[in-house]
Amino acid sequence: MKLEEKLEHNESLVGKSRPCLHDTHQANGKPIANGNPTANGKVEVYEKQEANGKGNRLGKCLNLYTWQEIQRHSQEADQWLVIDRKVYNVTDWAGKHPGGRRVLNHYAGQDATDAFRAMHLDLGMVKLYLKPLLIGELSPEEPSQEKNKNAQLVEDFRELRKTLEAMNMFSANLRFFFLHLAQILILEISAWLILHHFGSSWLVTILISFLLTVSQAQCSFLQHDLGHLSMFKKSKWNHLMHKFVMCHLKGLSADWWNYRHFQHHVKPNIYPKDPDIDVGPLFLVGDTQPIKYGKKKIKYIDYEKQHLYFYMVALPFLMPVYFNLQSMQVMYLRKYWMDIAWVSSFYIRYFITFGPFYGIFGTVLLIYLVKFIESPWIAYVTQMSHIPMKMSSEENHDWLSTQVVATCNIEQSFFNDWFTGHLNFQIEHHLFPTMPRHNYHKVAPLVKSLCAKHGLQYINKPILKAFGDIVRSLKKSASLWMNAYYE
């Protein structure tokens, strides 16, 4: 059969109901030998279904699809994705996805296997939600991932994950996290005791503002852990504690944070899927966005000086203005009543504890003074690992490559671990979001070795250089904009 005729023949079979095959494949994606061949050489695929706790196999024929067919379904109104060679139509269900609809849309038409494994705890339970969405599987002759991806790299990364699971690297040390929570609560209680004992003088106000700032920053890191389900074995306990830490202790919406942050994790530094780099028109970042703005002669502000705006705007106002207002807006527009109740308890707590000393207006000022001081801390920690790294439009690389090219690490020290909430191990965190952070340093050598094997640059830099690279990156982007704007 000629190549053209073979392609035409395969295309005519795409999406059609195929004879069925037992729901098992070899590592290379080929069907195992216990399938029953039919007249046309195809075999039947049966989906396992449990009935009354017994392993009964109910015959359910699945369609077979090529990657070419799957990639056509990549729009918000028509979303298919692949997990472990199974094809799912998530179009109508995306709005019900606990992690947000956009995360699914970002993988429409793609293999989402590694992202699925990375972002969930109990895969068996989660797959129950996927069962009604199953429409077929990859044709036996199709590779398990898109043809542009390095199959050996994908296999090596999955073997690494299995190794880490066997080493119990995904098991949390609860003592570590509860000591961290104790640190936060002790700082807050200390601030109130000092205020109660010494009064609300300027010196005392400065001191307690410092204590509350440290508490809030460390609270940011703890809520980040809980949002990623890395503390408890059960998702529900992580979610409940996340409400307490993020909403009650910080006064921000947990759901808002998760829906935003998960997008960043699955597609870091990818336009327009990563909300963390959607900072235009105030800032232009990366190499492509500045040139795009420049060629279109767009000049909302003086971009030549955007590195100065970073100091004047991004550092002090990220937490008290941008995050705070966006959190409130999303909570009320999407009617997150649970989060609204929890966040209300944050303000009630502050008015009860600090209101008698400062009054209502003074307490509000204290809240936002603390957020204002905390903001540069969080801005530096969150931006130093991403802003200087590669930014691009969707290229659909494998999970390891996607994360490594968009992130970098900061040298380890006791201070760096504490100051960054262990986000100095940003590469390991992005590869394994549900891994407890106290294990990052243990897996880093294995990740570095895998990167070296496949020619991926594993960047690890001093913290002060990382701070400086943010500004240098903004200057570089400004220069690209200038060249395109004035050419």
Curated annotation (Swiss-Prot):
GO terms for biological process: unsaturated fatty acid biosynthetic process. It is found in: Endoplasmic reticulum membrane. Residues 1-175, 223-307, 371-487 are cytoplasmic. Residues 1-11 have a biased composition (Basic and acidic residues). It is a multi-pass membrane protein. A motif (Histidine box-3) lies at residues 426-430. This is Fatty acid desaturase 2-like protein FADS2B. It comes from Mus musculus (Mouse). The lineage of its organism: Eukaryota, Metazoa, Chordata, Craniata, Vertebrata.
